[in-house]
């Protein structure tokens, strides 16, 4: 591997030799064990003897030890030596984990996986594993492909971010000194490199300067932050004394976008105080280094650094760290981060001022409480650096201004106070400088112009700290680590086991003892450490000791994590308390905690610094701080400054700020997918290679490493979904994989077979509801089994292929053998005959015989005539078929007209139904008014309720007496009060969020109170009564609270008293709830009264607008009808004009059906076919040009021969022979051209038929568009009906409200009525939303139809061009015929007797051909007319589409109006809910009169019974009214039947998709193989193309050589020409013949050159053809993308149809109010859906073609996988929330049941305790009443939370169902993908065939080229012979008359010799 050459590879993975060496160690699983050792942790040993539970072991050191068996731990086999993932260990125990880490650390393999996280051990030295080459090794690799490394985890986070579209976080945790900071820097560098943005174009920069990129700036933040935030501690030389969360933002393509930093818990105290062995922050020592010697002078640092107290209290240098080099890096980082020189200098000046300020000294004035400066040198230097006056600075420190009353005075400070003020200012100043640095870095890293879609957060925060002296800072650092550890535990352990519970597998919940909630609550909960610290900060005269004593009193002995500190040992400081953290027990000292928490600052000093003139940075950092004087001035001016001191409130402690930032951090982490890096300290000595076993084991335990591995081993870490499992492992059990449609059952069958075969055991796996779970390593075992099975199958497959190839090779060899035998026989015969004289004579005579050649030519002409006759017969047949199809179209048109007529009748029926609905609505209004009258009769019953209140009040008085008797017993439970109070406070904290919501509702209530003021005047009398009831209720609530408190304390001691109390409290609670509910509902209805009246007017006005819109739509319908009549007339005209095109149409229909069946295989071949047609047309054009050139050449030759005929008969005979041969060649070329023309004509016919089919589809789309438009109109009318119905219902509601002013007893019935109205409103809103979606669907379809119309227009234009091209070809063919006719006539002059008959026959056939051509031309003309008509139809269709678009836009505007109405109703509903809540709170205060009714209990019972009877009677009346209104509901069943039919038709539409999805499950296993085959095929094609290119290159070279030879021959010809000219001068009589001969030779040479160029052009065209084949693949992929988009549109259309179906079901409920209308609408919907169904069936071919688009579907599959993962994560999170809500609701139920039981039990005891209760005093009664009120409020809060919990539970359930549905959809998409892959394989095969055909075509062209080359050589030889004959003729020109026969014989001999040579060469 290339990786192994990297120098860092040896520190990442062992070599094979090392692995073999480690695995060859001796091992016995029964004897080799680990035993505990106090020094090494564990030692290896071997068992020698066993006796009972004792074993004797010989250690590796040779010692013999006897131990108990339980202390011995198993040893893993050598196979797992130095394993990279410790979860793979067979024996998982502490000893094995420690040994694995120790052995890897000894080999400097510092990274090791531990289950799901990574463990890294600090190597304490530099390793070459973080170089750029190492980083590149891990980029884009899976985590399992590479060795453990920080980069592997980082790359996994990066890929998860891009694939899952989820933010990621990397939590690098561990103790201080473990290497967190270094790993953080490496992670940041890696992400900067991966998402590098340097290649992006940016602004022009100076070419002499290096461009600073964003990744450089991100990396350079580390030196700056480390200089100001890192310091040396006892355990770490570069310890981060602050926490940071670095968010690196990326766009959706993974490109680096920006970065920002958030920091936490900066240790400010370090700047003024350092512990022994530690150092202040690095920046101070860097400034004092010699990197910039002049800097110290500028900063006035003239003393040794050891003399500056603030930075020199301990260490000054660090071993191994060069401050000069570090300062250089810091200064350069400032420049890269765009810090200006002034900003840098100001920052350094502030650091220098800090050092100077630490050296300022003060002394106490004698006998005064006033401090004064003891020397001003350092103060002057500090003031100089600050840019302020020295005297002003010192005065502000020693005499700060404070406010006394209303005046500001100077307050004297003693030395201690001044020193405190100096330290506080130093800490505050440094903290603000650090904040400024972080903000400046964030500003620089905030890049503009790149989207920030996702981020990866890297958390580096101070590790857990246990020092000798632990103070306020250590408490917060340890608290943060505690929270992070709990986050890790919850993510790693709880969620894992909850996954098992959700899947329903057999699993016992394991408690791994890592719940850190107790420690966290001890710190942050009420009465916790932080809460008590904040409380002490506001208590006067509070000190650190009072805080410590309160903490001890509150928690010692009561909380398991709070302990008394042990006495200090060694250097340990004194401690006030100890706390047990997850990492150990820490001793804390409370010294200065109050001051650190309050963090006070000297406002006078701050004011002076804000006036600085020499340091702009100082002014900037204090700009947001408001001093007391400034706040007072703003208060006087009305500025509202108050007393804020630069904080977020009037008093914000440091703890509050820390807690807020920590909560934000945890919230952010919970929204990301975490990746954990656990850093381990190997030893305390910072020595490389040494492991401190006890220290490492403690960290492993605290970090949860061992528990993580254990749960990973005990659980099932590997899992896969049922469909995925079945698809991948179906090869192991093919029969079982297809046994059932349920994938879970298939998975169970597969696993059962594997268990029966012995491949697996039942303990290795579990089958859940949706997934199969595996133990660690089982999945790898299954993969091995699968690979073996695949190897077996592939071996058999390969053997079959080899057998088949062998047979083919044998057949080829046999055919080759037969051909060779024939060739050999012919060669032998020729060798025998060539010396035979008769054969020689035959060879000379045969070429002179013309009869045979003429017969062959006549036969060829006869064949052509027959072919033309056949083509005419086919044309006649096509014409007849087109006529038949035209008749069918006429019938279809008539049926469409009948449908339009039915639509008109339906419109009139709809108007009648509207009138009926209005009448029904009036009747309903009357019935509701009667109900209102009945409700008004119940007003008198309110008085009965008041009497019931008095009776309950008497019972409360009895309870008071019993309470006095219980006082003595309650005192005994006083010791339990504190714990109960703690619980109450915790509940109060939980209720704070509810209180905030209540506060918001109160604000809304105030707004509503202004509106309801008039109504409240009418209710003033009721409010007076309510006030009186409030007073009584307050007393009773206090009583109940006291009862609750007393019963809580008495619960353990006296159970009998608890039971009595529960009974009483339950009864009181029930009565109170009844009163509260009645009051709330009464007030709610009163408030709604006014609103409903105003809303009624607005709804009525909207109804009028909608009616106007209905009339407008009716007018549009009439216009559409007139347009339909016009279209009918046009269609009638079109029917007459299409009679001649019927034949082509039937052919096209048949081809369309065939194409519909084959579209899955051909995919996007249409575009490729168009390209092939274009290529063939180009080839045909070239052939035509060649033919024309050949004709011209031959005509020239014939002209020359005619001139020579009179002068030299022999020369003419020779030329005629040559012309005959050339003519034969041209005849062949012409025949080929004619065949190509016929093919093109056939293609033209096909394209014409396709065009006609497309026109038919366009007409169908127009019909569909009109149908959809009518459907949209009908839906608009429905929406109007719904709106009018809604208005009427609202008016009815207003009438009801006016009748219910004082009807409190009937609130429940009115509430139900209100809920019905709300549900109707929701139904109307949902219906409107569905209408909007349908309109959007219509608009999308219209756009699609318009796009298809444009495509049809383009195809029509192409067809017209093709027709014109064919016409040109026919004209050229006609011209060729005329030329041949003239030529034959000329040749007939030579032999008139022999050729006269043939000429007559040819003339007759030519006339017949001419007639056929005329007929074809007339047919083309008719087709052209048809095309023109179709073009007009297409334009009309486009106009209709535009009109439909306009209608759709109008519908969209209408929908927006409806949406606004719905939004108004939604707002009003929210207002009503707010009013209801406000009324509930008001009416709680009006129910206190309940307990005055002492003597009315029996009357109350009677009244309640009467109310119940009345309620029953009213319910019965409402039921009767509902039955009356529902008389129209009988048609619902008819609607359901219609809807079922519609659903069946939609199922037919989805049939093709379902088949593809079913086939996908069985074919998914072919995906990987298909991809491999595709890559192989591509590589083979590329190789073959490369070979062809080489062949073509060789051919070009050969052509070049041939060209050179031709040029040489041309030169020789030129020489010959010169010689002939000289001869011409000598032979003046023969000059004309010589010129003609020379011209002929020149033309022959030119022809040869032309032929050569033409052949070269053909070779180039062949090469272009091969390149075009390559481009075809790219075009096909683009077609895949386009088709996939269309598939997405169709899918959305499918989903919208499903939504429409659901809308139809919801419309059934609405049909109760409009039964008659629903029946007609259902009929209309049936007609519309049937038309849509027919349209969808016609589009099935297009849908099937879309299935072949693979590449985009692969992207969809990946996206589906990502959504599936995200959905699973969401489901997991929702399940967690669901569990929490369930637990909370169960807890509330238990509390409620307990309270009810207590009230029931205490009722029995109250009577007995009545007499004793009188002995108590008024104070106890008041206390108990107060307690009753508190408990009642808590009870109300618990009820609200219980209701909220139920709501959240329902929402979570819905979310889980939605996610499950999404997962199912993703599965279906994946199944559909497999079908597409198979189709792509078929397409690849066709492309292979096309490539082979191209190769064959190239070979044929090469052969043709060779033949033409031979012919050219023959022509040159004949030219030579012609020149010889001419020379002979010139020599004998003056001879006697007998010379002519001599010339003739010599010419004949030449003619005989030339063909002989030609034939010999051809033979």
From Swiss-Prot:
The rodlike tail sequence is highly repetitive, showing cycles of a 28-residue repeat pattern composed of 4 heptapeptides, characteristic for alpha-helical coiled coils. Keywords: Actin-binding, ATP-binding, Coiled coil, Cytoplasm, Methylation, Motor protein, Muscle protein, Myosin, Nucleotide-binding, Thick filament, Ubl conjugation. Residues 848-1963 form a coiled coil. Residues 81-787 form the Myosin motor domain. It holds the Pfam family Myosin_head. This is Myosin-4. The keyword Coiled coil applies. GO terms for molecular function: actin filament binding; ATP binding; microfilament motor activity; structural constituent of muscle. Belongs to the TRAFAC class myosin-kinesin ATPase superfamily. Myosin family. It comes from Caenorhabditis elegans. Residues 970-988, 1133-1146, 1322-1336 have a biased composition (Basic and acidic residues). Muscle myosin is a hexameric protein that consists of 2 heavy chain subunits (MHC), 2 alkali light chain subunits (MLC) and 2 regulatory light chain subunits (MLC-2). Forms a complex composed of chaperone unc-45, unc-54 and ubiquitin-protein ligase ufd-2; promotes poly-ubiquitination of unfolded unc-54. Within the complex interacts with unc-45 (via UCS domain) and ufd-2. Interacts with itr-1 (via c-terminal coiled coil domain). Residues 970-990, 1125-1146, 1317-1336, 1912-1963 are annotated as: Disordered. Residues 1162-1173 are annotated as: Hinge. The gene is unc-54. Gene3D superfamilies: 1.10.10.820, 1.20.5.340, 1.20.5.370, 1.20.5.4820, 1.20.58.530, Kinesin motor domain (3.40.850.10), Myosin S1 fragment, N-terminal (2.30.30.360), Myosin VI head, motor domain, U50 subdomain (1.20.120.720). The modification N6,N6,N6-trimethyllysine is found at residue 125. Residues 28-77 form the Myosin N-terminal SH3-like domain. Residues 848-1161 are annotated as: Alpha-helical tailpiece (S2). Residues 662-684, 766-780 are annotated as: Actin-binding. One of its GO terms (cellular component) is myosin filament. SMART domains: MYSc. Residues 1162-1963 are annotated as: Light meromyosin (LMM).
